[in-house]
């Protein structure tokens, strides 16, 4: 149900089904499911309690995938580990715990579930035997990965995650390894700013949708001290909801470090939504798109140029107003 009091994306995954795979000591009644439902009110969510023993858990999830035929599967932590093995469906793994045996090694003894389960069980004993079961199941990850599967899977990794560190392991097998600003849990801020843009890419691909292209010159994003310009984040967040946004920077032949500096800046200030959305070129006029926000527009750009810093567009606030009036056109 749409809620006028919170920011939502009613068009995102509209009419589609999302399967959520929860983490260790959680359940299908996790607050994360409600949070995602609030963000995408016109999507249907499927989330079930995963059995404690991993063999049973994997069997249940495979049956659920076959029965429900979800359009997208999102798994967090332990659920991310399971989700990697649910082949044939578009998938997002958030801080996937591919090394569950090591992660659980400090958790031996009685543990309480963080969310209510349908079976009424509220605690479990973590034993060496259970840890071995999880270590064994993780050895099945990353098997028989085809190019088609690589294109279906995205991994999101918090740059401040204190529990799981599997970015490099994931990236050995899948190209779409993306960092975000956050810790281990999928909180609302992370879902809104980082998860939803990735879901939008997947949704567009499934729908065969091509959004209008907006280029933003890198020099419009930062000041002389390389700090973000006023209202830049506000404008960027608004634009990525409706447009395919690319950052354009120069590629100085005699300064190779500049490109690395730009990539680092974009990762720090824009993060996940800008993944694979940076273009380096010394010939901006050759780019083909719909709009170009640029302090020094190319005269022969085959689209609409917006001169950032001009009397008409002094700041990004004026640019927000301009695009708001366009309504995503």
Positions of the model-derived regions?
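The alpha/beta-hydrolase serine catalytic core
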Residues: 90-92, 96-202
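Short, acidic loop-to-helix structural element flanking the phosphoryl-transfer center
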Residues: 222-246
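Gly/Ala-rich beta-loop-alpha elbow adjacent to hydrolase catalytic centers
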Residues: 74-84
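Charged phosphate-binding loop/patch that engages nucleotide di/tri-phosphates or the phosphate backbone
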Residues: 3-7, 19, 176-211, 304-329
